[in-house]
A protein has these predicted regions:
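A sequence-level detector of short linear motifs
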Residues: 19-20, 44
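Mid-chain, structured segments of secreted extracytoplasmic proteins
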Residues: 37-82
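Short acidic, Pro/Gly- and aromatic-enriched capping/linker segments at domain boundaries
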Residues: 1-12
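Primarily extracytoplasmic ectodomains and periplasmic/lumenal surface modules that are beta-strand-rich
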Residues: 29-33
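Short, low-complexity, Pro/Ser/Thr/Gly-rich segments in the mature regions of secreted, periplasmic
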Residues: 83-95
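A short tyrosine-centered beta-strand micro-motif
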Residues: 21-27
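Short beta-strand segments
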Residues: 3, 44, 85-86
């Protein structure tokens, strides 16, 4: 699963600050991990799980939570899929 998303401001993904910009966000269900890419360059990754739902998502969406460090990516919904990806922890970061 993947989607293209534009962050209008800096966002925390796992333990990495991702600068405002347009990125591809992908979810690897086999490894329970999301990856944020700019082109082929990994900007951040984090552990995540797929929470299955009853209804197929009509559109891509992202949700954030506010932390002491700022806005943090919390969950991602991919259009056409039954479920929401919940970010559960930190893994690694790429270069900024």
């Amino acid at each position: 699963m993947r989607q293209i998303n534009t962050f209008n401001e800096d966002v925390l993904v796992g333990n990495t600050i991702v600068k405002a910009g347009t990125y591809t966000i992908s979810f690897d269900a086999d490894n329970n991990k999301i990856t944020v890419l700019r082109g082929r360059r990994v900007m951040a990754s984090a552990r995540a799980t797929l929470e299955m739902g009853d209804v197929r998502a009509r559109r891509d969406s992202v949700a954030f939570v506010m932390t002491d460090l700022g806005k943090k990516l919390d969950r991602i919904t991919f259009a056409g899929h039954f479920g929401t990806v919940i970010i559960t922890g930190d893994t690694s970061s790429g270069g900024q």
